[in-house]
Amino acid sequence: MKRFLWLSWMAFLFLICAGCGDTFRPIIIPNPPTFPDPKAAHTVIAVNDNGPISDGSVLVVDVSGDSEVGIGNVGIAPVHAVQQGASQVLVLNQATTSTSTASLSKVFFFGTVINGTIGTISLPPNSAPNFVTVAPSDTTAYVTLPNYVPDPTNFPDVVVPSVGVVSTTTNALVATIQVGNCPMEIAVTPDKSKLYVANNSPFCNPLTPGGSMSAFNTLDRSARPITGTLSSPPVWLSPRADSQRVYVLEANGTLAWLDTTVTAGPDTLTESPISVPGATVMVYDGHLNRLYIPGGSEVAVVDVSQSVPQIIGNNGNPLPISTFPRENRGPQDVCYGLHTDTPPAVTAGAAAALPDGSRAYVGAYYEDAAGNICSQVTVINTSNNSVKAVIGVPGFPNYDATCATTRFRFTMAAGGDSSRVYLASCDGGGVNDIDTSTDSFLVNLPAPFSNRAPIPPSQFAPPQNPVFLIPGP
């Protein structure tokens, strides 16, 4: 035992001596890393129309700086867009003349900046594409082709409404899937296993009634049976995060849902008693598992965590949206005026939910007697599902030549850090920036100049017309 103690002392003395040499050994004090600002840069991207013969554009807005950081040209008559992966956005260009070609524009990003040349994927000519979606984290895009002609040489009059399957790796249309008349909306379940298509005949031709749903397995593109019927044509689809439900908004405002839990099908279609007349879009909030359905002068807040969707708040009824008083607008606002006890009713047509789940925002507008579009944003507090505030957004003259018939006259998107929400206006030619910390209007970011003639007294061409808005990389 004493021997082991003696050896231990000798080892200890050796270590002390070794540390007392002439060589300096600095004491290293760890320098903690600088963590990124939680309000990291995020973008929103506005897709802008520039008339029937000129290329449209994308406008990139930096959320952290409330500024425009990039502009890129896309194809003629862009109508829709979707983000694919962390650094790529696909823009769908409908094209409007025999000399232009329908296409997908591939916009690459490095951070918040457009990176390199915007690529192009050609689509069948004159196929009138109107919607694009992708499977999450996939390299496949699905595009509606209402006027697709499989053999334009031998059978130029034979139209087969289809969904185009596009590889964004090879930049080619790899297959088509026949669907019902006038496909206008596509949804892919988050697990990438199923594809659903809303077919709406009146959307392509108001004189043609009817509508239907189509369903397919994405692996082999085989059809899935659907049981149940709709009382009016479908206009919007929203899959639930668990891929077990797909919600269907009908043209009459009724909310229906598809039960997709049976592996081989059939998928069961059921209508709910929920109705929001005038609604054309829905926004799914995956954080809270609910839908926001704006329409008319109201918005329905719908809990979809249950088997049967239920309206929450306001005693089971949609929340009414009041008109922002015109006397509360600034004197320079074209919509400014004296108080009236009977303000015009607004039309709600866009919504966005903050990623942090704290609030939702609804875009609405009315047109005054002078032809001005008077827009506003209503704030919904998600903790008690009530209206928190109404924000006036400066008005502007209408531009019915393009915007009266565009599918998305107003669109909305939220910044990735929940600090901003944006309202894009086709008529207004720009993107309105809302500060969510104060629920107040900040600034209007104009779209790029168009190829239209100046409108006196201005000497400059008016801006292009935003027709869609999405959160970006």
Report each predicted region and the residues it spans.
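Predominantly soluble domains enriched in secretory-pathway, periplasmic, or organellar proteins
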Residues: C20-P473
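Sec-dependent bacterial lipoprotein signal peptides
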Residues: M1-G19
